[in-house]
Amino acid sequence: MIYAGILAGGIGSRMGNVPLPKQFLDIDNKPILIHTIEKFILVSEFNEIIIATPAQWISHTQDILKKYNITDQRVKVVAGGTDRNETIMNIIDHIRNVNGINNNDVIVTHDAVRPFLTQRIIKENIEVAAKYGAVDTVIEAIDTIVMSKDKQNIHSIPVRNEMYQGQTPQSFNIKLLQDSYRALSSEQKEILSDACKIIVESGHAVKLVRGELYNIKVTTPYDLKVANAIIQGDIADD
């Protein structure tokens, strides 16, 4: 089976003084989360579309689903965890409790605050994860990347044409991700905040799918302005 895991567990501290977590803020008079869910509903391959949100915001999430007529029975809401990976594991726990987990099951995980992903990106994630077990969505780095260990001096400059910027979705064979996560120590779980990094550390290859420049993550007031400009300018592909 194929599952979507929409990660809406953040509280949006970088957004500044706002009344709601960032995933519930509006762009073009509609919550960011709803824009994102609508993209996933269009994909018939998904057996379930699972939204993980802070426990105290579950009721609000359910309310906005009703308000914006999200009636697709595949859409479920569960409580997120204390960090990104724990949130993903909570989604997987839901899957295991409801349907069990089979060897070929795939989960497509995606930031709730990336509302501009395309159908191509989603479907390529499904195809590549089903074939290879793990995939990340990336774009080529445009700017030169510099590394600094002390935040004051450059310690190295990687070769730019080998650098990519990670986006989401990140998609996995569920058993591969679950087994890789369970093998981590408590210390590793605190350090390895990215699911693809966990897979890489386990020794398994992670394939790449091409993202889009406009597949932005809305985390700051500036991002919110850019997101509204993208919608009003009809920049993003469907």
From Swiss-Prot:
A family per Pfam: IspD
Recorded GO terms, molecular function?
2-C-methyl-D-erythritol 4-phosphate cytidylyltransferase activity; D-ribitol-5-phosphate cytidylyltransferase activity
Tell me the route in metabolism or biology where this protein functions: Cell wall biogenesis; poly(ribitol phosphate) teichoic acid biosynthesis
The answer on whether this UniProt entry bears the keyword Nucleotidyltransferase reads yes
Site label Positions ribitol 5-phosphate for the nucleophilic attack, positions: R160, K217
Its GO biological process terms? cell wall organization; isoprenoid biosynthetic process; poly(ribitol phosphate) teichoic acid biosynthetic process
User: What's the stated role of this polypeptide?
Assistant: Catalyzes the transfer of the cytidylyl group of CTP to D-ribitol 5-phosphate.
Which NCBIfam families does this entry report, sorted A to Z? PRK00155.1-3 (NF001183), PRK13385.1 (NF009924)
Protein name (database record): Ribitol-5-phosphate cytidylyltransferase 2
Organism annotation: Staphylococcus aureus (strain bovine RF122 / ET3-1)
Query: Lineage in the entry?
Result: Bacteria, Bacillati, Bacillota, Bacilli, Bacillales
- Gene designation per UniProt: tarI2
